[in-house]
């Protein structure tokens, strides 16, 4: 659908110059789209670095050697933009100020420091974001790096290649997406890696029960994880990093330190010229990417986008929204028309060794922080038919409104299949769907690809059962003291992986439950558990229909519980199904 935005007038023959500040995802997309929509416009792209458009999401994989050819990361060279799109690309040119009244940008040539004024009829700001560099002692030591540009990537790759066999120890500060991707790739390059995270879990955007699987994968691959600690200082000798000291005084030796603790939007240019910021500190835009000055647009990591799951706005430093926003801004700037930017949802994914974590929308923690009432449903199920070779478990969590069932978000972890489930759920979320909509989805199925009852369906069934009063769930991290806890797995399963309940557990296999109801107190609140929750639901229905007053199913069963609440003793563990 094409729509006319505020101030959305096509540039006349007398007003034909579009200036774009910043390249990469937002700016380069804007430039290319603007040219496709207007052959007559003069389009000037200013980029302070030498690389105009590159795949920054691929940089960790070049450092680790998975991507062998550096040139593959260059999405569009300056020369390609000049010849194919007739764009005036000015590399190593920095916009230092904007005069809105005069409609000029002050530009500094970084090669010689000279400056000039550049007039514009429409202006697009795509300044991106900068890595957060904490003001710590030793932070500027040689061997301390952040990763935002190809130059950063080249410096890190050179340090990795030059590191001798006896000095390949790395600290990664921050356990978000970039931090964990870098940890994986440094292990691939033969480094001993330690990850430091200020929060109490890795992947802080996820709920703890899903993030626990990724932490297990890190540990399985030799990565030591330090949670609930930050950096106090970088230790150096002769200007060269020797390690770090954590906030609790722990000293970790290392020859390489990677800072992945977040980014800060580059809004200085916007603030200086009087553009409005949003509540999260990004440039405020409308659905057509116009700022508070309708002749100036903004796109990319410095922008606050409409936030779909809970309303309002949010900064989302992801390539997908930046590309879409740049494309729309470029079209609207030269034609006055474009489709409205849809709200973003933070749909994202990361691979950590043999596991994948993906999410869209709100986690339980984020929903509660936003003041939203929510419930969740978690299942552990095969990513395709169990009888077909290569089946592996996928953990899938839906977050939804407790009365309407409207989907608020979803998370998934597993060796395979997390991506396609989250993509489906992102679509449901974008169109305001509910868990009942998910339960009724018609999805493709053949044994190599899925199950007749997909994990999506199974999670939605759990949610619908709770909405319909057929199966209340208890959060996996709940304190079980005061509950009558019944484990309906077989004796062998219980022995192999005891339920970490912190209280007495009554083991009654499901197939024996009807004959042993007398061993239980029907008036006492009861928690039932199995391996992943399926048999526990059957037990729950039996007990409720035999007059038990309150029966809840422990979300995710013993498998998820043991991730979130570690076993009290070092017993023999194994797969629990």
Named regions from a protein language model:
Residues 12-89, 94, 183-206, 338-340, ...:
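Beta1-alpha1 glycine-rich phosphate/pyrophosphate-binding loop at the start
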Residues 73-74, 167-171, 177-234, 316-322, ...:
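Rossmann-like dinucleotide-binding cores of NAD(P)H-dependent redox enzymes
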Residues 27, 179-180, 536:
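N-terminal Rossmann-fold NAD(P) dinucleotide-binding loop
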Residues 40-42, 84, 90-111, 118, ...:
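A Rossmann-like FAD-binding core segment of flavoenzymes
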Residues 12-17, 302-415, 447-451, 455-483:
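Mid-to-C-terminal Rossmann-like scaffold of FAD/NAD(P)H-dependent oxidoreductases
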Residues 125-189, 224, 285-287, 505-516, ...:
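Glycine-rich dinucleotide-binding loop and its adjacent helix/turn
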Residues 140-164, 236-245, 250-331, 424, ...:
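FAD-site-proximal beta/loop scaffold in flavoenzymes
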Residues 7, 436-447, 451-484, 490-527, ...:
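Rhodanese-like catalytic fold shared by cysteine-dependent sulfurtransferases
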């Amino acid at each position: 659908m094409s729509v006319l935005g505020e101030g959305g007038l096509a540039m006349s023959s007398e007003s034909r110059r579009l200036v774009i500040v910043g390249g990469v995802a937002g700016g380069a997309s804007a430039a290319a789209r603007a040219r496709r929509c207007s052959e007559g416009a003069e389009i000037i792209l200013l980029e302070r670095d030498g690389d105009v458009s590159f795949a920054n999401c691929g940089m960790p994989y070049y450092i680790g050697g998975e991507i062998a050819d550096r040139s593959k990361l260059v999405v569009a060279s300056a020369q390609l933009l000049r010849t194919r799109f007739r764009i005036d690309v000015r590399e190593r040119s920095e916009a230092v100020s904007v005069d809105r009244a005069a409609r000029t940008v002050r530009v500094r040539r970084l090669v010689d420091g000279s400056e000039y004024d550049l007039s514009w009829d429409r202006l697009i700001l795509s300044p991106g974001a900068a890595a957060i560099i904490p003001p710590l002692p030793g932070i500027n030591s040689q061997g301390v790096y952040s990763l935002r540009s190809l130059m950063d990537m080249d410096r890190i790759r050179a340090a990795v290649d030059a590191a001798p066999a006896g000095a390949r120890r790395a600290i990664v500060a921050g356990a978000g997406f970039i931090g964990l991707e870098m940890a994986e790739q440094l292990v691939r390059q033969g480094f001993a890696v330690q990850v430091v995270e200020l929060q109490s879990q890795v992947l802080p955007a996820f709920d703890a029960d899903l993030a626990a699987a990724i932490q297990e994968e890190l540990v399985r691959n030799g990565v030591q994880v330090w949670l609930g600690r930050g950096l106090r200082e970088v230790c150096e000798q002769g200007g060269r990093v020797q390690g770090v000291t954590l906030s609790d005084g722990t000293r970790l030796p290392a020859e390489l330190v990677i800072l992945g603790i977040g980014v800060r939007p580059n809004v200085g240019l916007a603030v200086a010229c009087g553009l409005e910021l949003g509540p999260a500190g990004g440039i405020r835009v409308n659905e057509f990417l116009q700022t508070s000055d309708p002749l100036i647009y903004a796109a990319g990591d410095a922008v606050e986008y409409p936030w779909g799951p809970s309303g309002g706005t949010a900064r989302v430093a992801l390539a997908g929204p930046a590309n879409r926003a740049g494309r729309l801004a470029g079209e609207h700037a030269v034609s006055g028309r474009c489709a409205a930017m849809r709200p973003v949802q933070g749909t994202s994914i990361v691979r950590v060794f043999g596991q994948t974590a993906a999410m869209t929308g709100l986690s339980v923690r984020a929903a509660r922080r936003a003041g939203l009432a929510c419930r969740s449903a978690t299942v552990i199920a095969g990513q395709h038919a169990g009888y077909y070779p290569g089946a592996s478990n996928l953990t899938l969590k839906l977050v939804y409104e407790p009365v309407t069932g409207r989907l608020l978000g979803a998370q998934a972890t597993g060796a395979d299949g997390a991506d396609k489930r989250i993509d489906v759920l992102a679509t449901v979320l974008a169109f305001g769907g509910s868990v009942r909509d998910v339960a009724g989805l018609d999805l493709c199925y053949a044994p190599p690809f899925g199950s007749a009852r997909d994990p999506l369906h199974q999670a939605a069934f759990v949610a619908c059962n709770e909405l319909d009063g057929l199966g209340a769930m208890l959060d996996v991290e709940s304190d079980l003291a005061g509950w009558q806890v019944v484990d309906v797995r077989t004796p062998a399963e219980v022995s192999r992986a005891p339920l970490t309940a912190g209280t007495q557990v009554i083991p009654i296999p499901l197939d024996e439950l009807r004959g042993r109801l007398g061993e239980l107190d029907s008036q006492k609140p009861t928690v039932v558990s199995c391996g992943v929750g399926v048999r526990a639901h059957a037990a729950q229905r039996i007990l409720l229909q035999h007059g038990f007053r309150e029966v809840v199913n422990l979300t995710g069963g013993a498998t998820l519980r043991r991730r979130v609440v570690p076993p009290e003793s070092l017993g023999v563990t194994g797969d629990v199904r």
